[in-house]
């Protein structure tokens, strides 16, 4: 029964990712004053299914002199890690109310960096390798400030439990500043615009996944967008309000739309400014938040 529920959850996640990509294309097309997908099905509603069939039915080639085993297994590993993230979210039918599931989230997010690095290295392409190194450096840098902000919320709520954090009230006025920095860190962590330097077309073509196409590219694509939806859910639980299911769903949709608007509105940032923003602005602020929460514990 648990296996069936897990498979059903994964299927729902993949369907959500499929239609989230359709929503992204519709939003970007509206911002650019064009129609977007509107041919496949009613108003283009089944366009993601057509795209998936096209990708998975393509013939698959392995680059010459590449590490074939790692090249083939890493996209599947990336998708598996992204789907495993959803196991830490408490639900009535998954029986996962363990108090320390947040530690599992920290471990899984740290592991995903290796997928990026080795996917770039195993392709035997200098462009993919440089893209992998750049994406890994960016992910590791922003992961520090993101986890510090997360532990600030843990110290304020005085619990590691997702369920208890969801039932708690927001952390007051300071939550608006923290939410802005958390959202920017999530954009950088998931390699989304304006921080998508792993895919700087003028420099690295498509980053670490330049040699992937067809089904392998689709798996990496699903992993990326699954992580985005999970970050939207996590932001709502730990930094906003999630006691009522309707309000929680509305807030998740608003944050998911913010990811799309950030891509359509802002130009790509400069890489050196991105790193300076992390180490000189976000990290000191995150440390100040931790010190503030520790002072509250002492008082």
UniProtKB/Swiss-Prot annotation:
It is found in: Mitochondrion inner membrane. Its EC number is 7.1.1.2. Keywords: Electron transport, Membrane, Mitochondrion, Mitochondrion inner membrane, NAD, Respiratory chain, Translocase, Transmembrane, Transmembrane helix, Transport, Ubiquinone. GO terms for biological process: aerobic respiration. The chain crosses the membrane at residues 2-22, 69-89, 101-121, 136-156, 167-187, 214-234, 242-262, 279-299. It is a multi-pass membrane protein. The keyword Transmembrane helix applies. It catalyses: a ubiquinone + NADH + 5 H(+)(in) = a ubiquinol + NAD(+) + 4 H(+)(out). One of its GO terms (cellular component) is mitochondrial inner membrane. InterPro entries: NADH_UbQ_OxRdtase_su1/FPO (IPR001694), NADH_UbQ_OxRdtase_su1_CS (IPR018086). GO terms for molecular function: NADH dehydrogenase (ubiquinone) activity. It is an enzyme of class 7 (translocase). Core subunit of the mitochondrial membrane respiratory chain NADH dehydrogenase (Complex I) that is believed to belong to the minimal assembly required for catalysis. Complex I functions in the transfer of electrons from NADH to the respiratory chain. The immediate electron acceptor for the enzyme is believed to be ubiquinone. Belongs to the complex I subunit 1 family. This is NADH-ubiquinone oxidoreductase chain 1. It comes from Albinaria caerulea. The lineage of its organism: Eukaryota, Metazoa, Spiralia, Lophotrochozoa, Mollusca. The gene is ND1.
């Amino acid at each position: 029964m648990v296996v069936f529920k897990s498979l059903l959850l994964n299927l729902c996640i993949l369907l959500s990712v499929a239609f989230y990509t359709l929503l992204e294309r519709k939003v970007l097309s509206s911002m650019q004053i064009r129609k977007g997908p509107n041919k496949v099905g009613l108003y283009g509603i089944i366009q993601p299914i057509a795209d998936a069939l096209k990708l998975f039915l393509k013939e698959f080639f392995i680059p010459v002199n590449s590490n074939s085993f790692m090249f083939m297994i890493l996209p599947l590993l990336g998708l598996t890690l992204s789907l495993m993230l959803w196991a830490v979210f408490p639900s009535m039918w998954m029986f996962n109310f363990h108090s320390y599931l947040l530690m599992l989230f920290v471990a899984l997010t740290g592991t995903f960096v290796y997928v990026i690095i080795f996917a770039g290295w195993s392709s035997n392409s200098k462009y993919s390798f440089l893209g992998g190194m750049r994406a890994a450096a960016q992910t590791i840098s922003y992961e520090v400030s993101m986890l510090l902000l997360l532990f600030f919320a843990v110290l304020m709520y005085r619990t590691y439990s997702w369920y208890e954090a969801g039932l708690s009230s927001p952390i007051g006025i300071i939550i608006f500043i923290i939410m802005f920095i958390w959202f920017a860190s999530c954009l950088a962590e998931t390699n989304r615009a304006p921080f998508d330097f792993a895919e700087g077309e003028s420099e690295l073509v498509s980053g670490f996944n330049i040699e992937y196409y067809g089904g392998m590219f689709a798996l990496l694509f699903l992993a990326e967008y699954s992580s985005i939806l999970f970050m939207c859910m996590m932001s709502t639980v730990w930094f906003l309000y999630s006691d009522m299911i309707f309000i929680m769903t509305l807030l998740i949709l608003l944050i998911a739309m913010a990811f799309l608007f950030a891509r359509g509105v802002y130009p790509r940032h400069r890489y050196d400014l991105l790193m300076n923003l992390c180490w000189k602005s976000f990290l000191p602020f995150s440390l100040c938040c931790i010190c503030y929460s520790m002072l509250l514990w002492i008082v």
